[in-house]
């Protein structure tokens, strides 16, 4: 039991400096601090300055105080207050204490602890005022007097430092402020480094072109399908022996394109309102073949699906296999040249008809 009483009455050391006796309790930080460290910690910013703090009990030196007894000249917590004033001594003069915020000056702490301070003359320091304190009071409150004097030195040092910075920041009264034009002249000429030359770039950029409008060296007109659907190189000599066979102006659509190619259709409209749906199969190698105008394009892998031809006038579908309309990469050079020549003649004839 004796050991417990000794532990409860042990003086708490400041948790910040570990040197002085703790006299202040911060509720937000749950920390015991001395006066100097209390000012340093809670003057760092405005948020820390809002922390509620109170003085530690002078009796148990452990709990935050709630009342000051002027007869005992002590700050007391709830338990110590009941212990001292639970009997007939309840007539003692007491005053309830409230928590404080911010960073009070050292003189306010001196007044709170009951020391007489000369308020009329601010030039008189606390050290000069404390010289008039009785030796008995100095012995009893020597630790708090030391902390108050140390706090005053810190606050005076900070005030002198801030005033010197203010004086250095103020311009000389003999020096006129510069005009805005002169201030711009004094700035380093670093704007030239930010100039970027875009002359090497072409005026018409092709970065936004779609996949179907890619620029091919074989297609001077930069179009994927320049001729009509009839101009595609068809193996008329080998497969389509009937010279009267022609593809009419009809709508060409791929049925089951999602099942066949695994992608959504991307229609491209030409002059005859023909829609060509195509997709590249990523799981197979893409093979190149020659078209009627000798342009290498990519062909999807042949499949067993059907192509439905439906005229705009009639709704009777004609189903043909893909072998009916197919490209023949195995043609000889002479046959291909004949096909190209015939197609050029057809094209020239159409151009003349349009001009007429």
UniProtKB/Swiss-Prot annotation:
Belongs to the CONSTANS family. Zn(2+) 2 binds at residues 57, 60, 80, 85. PROSITE patterns: ZF_BBOX (PS50119). GO terms for cellular component: nucleus. PANTHER family: BNAA07G24720D PROTEIN, ZINC FINGER PROTEIN CONSTANS-LIKE 10. SMART domains: BBOX (SM00336). This is Putative zinc finger protein At1g68190. One of its GO terms (biological process) is regulation of DNA-templated transcription. Zn(2+) 1 binds at residues 14, 17, 37, 42. It is found in: Nucleus. Residues 159-178 are annotated as: Disordered. Keywords: Metal-binding, Nucleus, Repeat, Zinc, Zinc-finger. A zinc finger (B box-type) spans 14-56, 57-97. GO terms for molecular function: DNA-binding transcription factor activity; zinc ion binding.
């Amino acid at each position: 039991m004796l050991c417990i009483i000794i532990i409860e009455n042990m003086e708490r050391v400041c948790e910040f400096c570990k040197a002085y006796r703790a006299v202040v309790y911060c509720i937000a930080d749950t920390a015991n601090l001395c006066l100097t460290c209390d000012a340093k910690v809670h003057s760092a910013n405005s948020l820390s300055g809002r922390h509620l703090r109170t003085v530690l009990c002078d009796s148990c030196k452990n709990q935050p105080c709630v009342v000051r007894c002027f007869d005992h000249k002590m700050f007391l917590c709830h338990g110590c207050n009941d212990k001292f004033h639970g009997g007939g001594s309840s007539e003692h003069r007491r005053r309830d204490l409230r928590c404080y915020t911010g960073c009070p000056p050292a003189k306010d702490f001196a007044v709170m602890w009951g020391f007489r301070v000369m308020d009329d003359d601010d030039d008189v320091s606390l050290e000069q005022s404390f010289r008039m304190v009785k030796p008995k009071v100095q012995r009893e409150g020597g630790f708090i007097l030391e902390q108050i004097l140390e706090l005053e030195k810190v606050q005076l040092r900070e005030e002198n430092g801030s005033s010197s910075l203010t004086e250095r920041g103020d311009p000389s009264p003999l020096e006129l402020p510069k005009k805005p034009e002169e201030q711009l002249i004094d700035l380093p000429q670093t704007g030239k480094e930010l100039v970027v030359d875009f002359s090497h770039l072409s005026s018409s950029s092709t970065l936004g072109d779609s996949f179907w409008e890619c620029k091919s060296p074989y297609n001077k007109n930069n179009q994927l399908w320049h001729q009509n659907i009839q101009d595609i190189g068809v193996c008329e000599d080998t497969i389509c022996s009937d010279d009267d066979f022609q593809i009419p102006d009809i709508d060409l659509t791929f049925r089951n394109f999602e099942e066949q190619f695994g992608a959504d259709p991307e229609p491209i409209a030409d002059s005859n309102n023909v829609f060509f749906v195509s997709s590249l199969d990523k799981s197979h190698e893409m093979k190149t073949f020659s078209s009627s105008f000798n342009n290498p394009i990519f062909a999807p892998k042949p499949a067993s699906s059907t192509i439905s031809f439906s005229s705009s006038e009639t709704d009777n579908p004609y189903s043909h296999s893909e072998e009916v309309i197919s490209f023949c990469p195995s043609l000889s050079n002479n046959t291909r040249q004949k096909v190209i020549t015939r197609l050029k003649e057809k094209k020239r004839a159409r151009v003349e008809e349009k001009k007429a």
